[in-house]
Amino acid sequence: MKTRLGGRTWAALLTFGLFGQIAWVIENMYFNVFLYNTISGNTSMIAAMVAWSAVTATVTTLVMGALSDRLGRRKALIVIGYLLWGVSIGAFAFIKRSPLAGAAHSAAVLVVVMDCVMTFFGSTANDAAFNAWVTDVTVPENRGRVETVLAIMPLVAMLVVFGALDGLTQAGNWRLFFLIVGGITCLGGVLGCFFIREPGLPRGQGSYFANILYGFRPAVIRGNPR
């Protein structure tokens, strides 16, 4: 494999590296504020949202990552995943607060459920498929450079969100905030149709569940300490 990455590959790396991290900034730093300030002041709902989204992200990455390996395909999961990820983020724009205690609790539960749905799509597209694609299209000679660029993206994403979008939340304009971020994420899916090239992987062999458990084998862990 060539050690030099082409412009199309770099375009995909930068696009998904940035757009994906922008979406994760919203999930990690703004959903709890949105839930507390506009839906319910019950902090137990925030704790539930954080816990369930973490579980969803972990399980999804394992299950969908193994599915991607099994199918030998990355592009479809990345493109469709980003499109649905963006739609699920934009859907938060249409959740409204109710003055009734029972309705407010139901709305808070809905936010928690939708956060898990959003996390499922995000973990499928970014954590499982995109990260695997990065490994597929790089080699040890250039992987360090690529990983360095991607490691910077969370900081760039925070600067973009805080600099360009945080004012919307301060003004209480959550609807526009979520629609913009959802649109950016969907745009990533659209661009993926043009930027992402399938690495041409063979279909995975063996049992699907055996592939999921493969990474937990002590011998595999000892053989891959980093």
Which residues does each predicted region cover?
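Central cavity-lining transmembrane alpha-helices of secondary-active solute carriers
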Residues: 46-68, 87
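Cytoplasmic membrane-interface "Motif A"-like loop-to-helix N-cap segments
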Residues: 70-84
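Glycine-rich segments within core transmembrane alpha-helices of 12-TM secondary carriers
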Residues: 56-58, 144-169
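A membrane-interface helix-boundary motif in multi-pass transporters
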Residues: 74, 102-106, 166-185
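C-terminal ends and interior cores of transmembrane alpha-helices
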Residues: 80-105
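C-terminal membrane-cytosol helix-exit motif in multi-pass small-molecule transporters
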Residues: 183-202
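Juxtamembrane intracellular "pre-TM" segments in multi-pass secondary transporters
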Residues: 1-7, 200-226
